[in-house]
Amino acid sequence: TRLSRGLGDVYKRQVSLRYFNVYGERQPLRGTYAPVVGLFLEQKKAGKPLTIVGDGEQRRDFTHVKDVVKANLACIDSVIGGYQTINIGTGKNYSVNEIAAMISDNIEFIPERPGECRETLASNSKASYYLDWEPTIDIKDWINEYEV
């Protein structure tokens, strides 16, 4: 926005980190827009079917909270000038169906929500350039290690 850029010009440094579908320890487990990974794990734990919204072919770039923390720390230590918006994601996406299949085969589809995005996929080029940051945790590996 113009206000953000104006403040960036005055204070010479303003950075926004844009997170992509954060999951991991202490993730929210309730609410309409709670992260799907946490919801699925909670549903499996309760012995319930995993509820997939729509056809499940929506694709998401899932980022582990530890990678988000590392990106924030790298940003604090960086010497970025001006105004920058930096994506924090993995640069790889999975369909909701793929994530569900990693957790359980007990699946139920529910109606699609209007206006839901079909795909998210981060470009980490700025994070790599400005923060010397790369993601280290893949969701497949995390789910396999998690007690499912």
Put a short name on every predicted segment.
Residues 1, 18-19, 55:
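Short, well-ordered beta-to-alpha junction loops that form the rim of enzyme active sites
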Residues 1-11:
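Single conserved hydrophobic/aromatic residue that forms the stacking wall/gate
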Residues 5, 44-148:
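C-terminal substrate-binding subdomain of Rossmann-fold SDR/epimerase-dehydratase oxidoreductases
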Residues 12-35:
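Flexible, glycine-rich beta-alpha linker
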